[in-house]
Amino acid sequence: MNDRRLLLVHAHPDDETIVTGATMARYAAEGAHITLVTCTLGEEGEVIPPELAHLASDREGGLGEYRVTELERACAALGVHDQRFLGGKGRYRDSGMMGAPTNSHPACFWQADVDTAAHELAAIIREVRPQVIVTYDDNGGYGHPDHIQAHRVTMRAFAQAADPSLPGTPWQARKLYAIAQPRKLLEESVARMQADPGPFTAPTAVEDIAPGTPDDLVTTRIDGSAYWEKKRDALQAHATQVAVAGTRFALSNGIAQEIHAVEYFTLLHGPEPRRGPDGYETDLFA
């Protein structure tokens, strides 16, 4: 273990693996302390395996607790030993997709008071004292209300944790990143999936996967290729939400996506990135 500390804020179980799994596995293997803060239990997820369909929120329920177990297995696969739920397990409920009636549930994360949730996260930041914090961009990557709220809460907590006027010992993280999915690379990936989607449905456009990040906004490239299998294993742990086949996976919509072990980020706060010849910074702690 070294003195590097990385804290990631994600909305639901499985988000951590899909977009940052290789990064987490790499830094964990290199001895960094990884703290994963998950904001909800993912109660509104659609269930893929027919034998587990009864867990869905519109049937018997129980999906949230089941996904806690999946998250534990995924973290074990990635080598992550410090996973927490914001405000405690079950404090905030999955809000569902934007526009769903569940957006109005009084306990859902979308309805949470941002200052209150940020205070809870700031307390974790002050305890862990990470040099680097990672979350979503202001659109939450693809517009999910819980992802957007995670961004808002993290931005507020980043400031609160460093504020000496608030009770407790302040902590200023050196860097804050948003997860990025470069548009050009998504286009190339979609073309490969259109040519060979495996057992899944081929995407018709980039938007079937995510809007993508404008390429000029992407600052950082983390090569986790050596940890591709760990990411795949973690994806397989999230079996209610993710189907895995070879180098591909699909969510409940059945659309083929590649399992990427090279992951990208946009620096939101911190010193100017030390970019290499390819134009990217290659270490979150640089």
Swiss-Prot record:
Zn(2+) binds at H12, D15, H147. Its cofactor is Zn(2+). It holds the Pfam family PIG-L. One of its GO terms (biological process) is mycothiol biosynthetic process. It is an enzyme of class 3 (hydrolase). The keyword Zinc applies. Its EC number is 3.5.1.103. Keywords: Hydrolase, Metal-binding, Zinc. InterPro entries: GlcNAc_PI_deacetylase-related, LmbE-like_dom_sf, Mycothiol_biosynthesis_MshB. One of its GO terms (molecular function) is zinc ion binding. Catalyzes the deacetylation of 1D-myo-inositol 2-acetamido-2-deoxy-alpha-D-glucopyranoside (GlcNAc-Ins) in the mycothiol biosynthesis pathway. This is 1D-myo-inositol 2-acetamido-2-deoxy-alpha-D-glucopyranoside deacetylase. The gene is mshB.
